[in-house]
Amino acid sequence: MKQGLSPDWITRLFEHPDLLRMGHHQRAEDQNLGMGWLYYAFGRMIRPRLAVVIGSWRGFVPLMIAKALQDNLESGEVVFIDPSLADDFWKDAARVNDYFLSLGVANIRHFRLTTQEFVKTSDYRALGKIGLVFIDSLHTEQQAQFDYEAFSGMLEPRGFVMLHDSMIVRPDKVYGGEKAYGMSVKYFVDRLKQDPMLQLLDLPFGHTGLTLLRKLDEEATRNPYDWLDDGPR
């Protein structure tokens, strides 16, 4: 598989119509990955050993981040957590593996669990440091907080958290109209914005937005060149 986001790879990706859905600002007509460009870029820029993605309709985000990590010299891995509650798409482990491999991505490890279940496993305890966390599970304030608190303590010093569906409060019908619930991730993000040791940026793209989060250095007075790669230029 060639490195980078080639036109051929994007064409193969968008042969799956569901990979154009769920608010990532994609568009097939001009092979536009929307926020997928950002997900890939962060994977390439941070170069993490490990990224965690919580929730995905058909795998757009884990695919974009895993493609980036696979293209890096460091050959990182994506841990993808999704219990397949919306439908049966993620239930068959062999089918899931074949699906990702069909798109040339071989570094996604899927766990068909909720975050609440995953944190009780030996796999969770063995994770170590994480460079990138993407939160897109049940879109409630409470679940977003649980997901964040489960992984934020493992974040690398220059790691990032991305929270999807973070700017709009509205009904969420992903489980069907009869099981609609209130999307409220924004309320958790609003609380995070009150923490002076966090830096957050809202990106108003897609249907419901994305928020980037990084932890500020606890030694805020030190020279920034101490942590920038290679010092001043």
Language-model regions: role of each:
Residues M1-K2, D30, A220:
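Intrinsically disordered, low-complexity regions enriched in Ser/Pro/Gly/Gln/His and often acidic
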Residues F14-M45:
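Class I SAM-dependent methyltransferase Rossmann-like catalytic core
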Residues H25, Y40-R233:
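S-adenosylmethionine/decaboxylated-SAM
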Residues M1-L19:
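N-terminal, positively charged/glycine-rich alpha-helical extensions of SAM-dependent methyltransferases
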